[in-house]
Amino acid sequence: TKDFNTGDNHGCGYFQVTEKNGFRCSTAVGYLNPVKKRSNLKIITKAHVKKINFENKVAKEVEYWIENKLFTVSADKEIILSSGSIGSPQILQVSGIGNPNKLKGLGIEMIHELNGVGENLQDHLMFRPIYKIQNIKSLNKKINSLFGNLLIGLEYIFNRSGPMTMGASQ
């Protein structure tokens, strides 16, 4: 697949990694640090979201806990929910978005029926075929020799390319 994020990710393809200027980096270094001083962005750490509050099906507030104190923050334009493959569906469900048959039984007021919320967690299967080859220069031959490692290192240092730019799971 050319892009694992298109929704049709059957097949195989190159892994996407976060990099900046040829260096692997965390999401915070690649995306958050460059914008964290914006006046329209507030980053709150050590918080646990209780729920999102809606007004006419538009997200307006987020209730969150820090230690034992409940806070509410409101947004003028948008709220971005980015709490992972388990946290995001859980927050949506406690906020009233999901399968009504499940949420009503828990006493959660329905905001929007969306049956797929919390129902589509998939394992990320990775299959590594192993082949024995002859008379072909392979990456394994390079990385299993001191000279090969030196060449790999130099290619990365001078060109920001080669095996050292690949994700660990490639």
What are these language model-derived features?
Residues 19, 30-31, 108, 118, ...:
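Short, well-ordered helical secondary-structure segments
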Residues 52-55, 59-153:
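Glycine-rich loop(s) and the adjacent beta-strand/alpha-helix scaffold that form part
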Residues 18-22, 90, 155-162:
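Active-site rim elements
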Residues 1-59, 65, 128-153:
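Conserved redox-cofactor binding core of oxidoreductases
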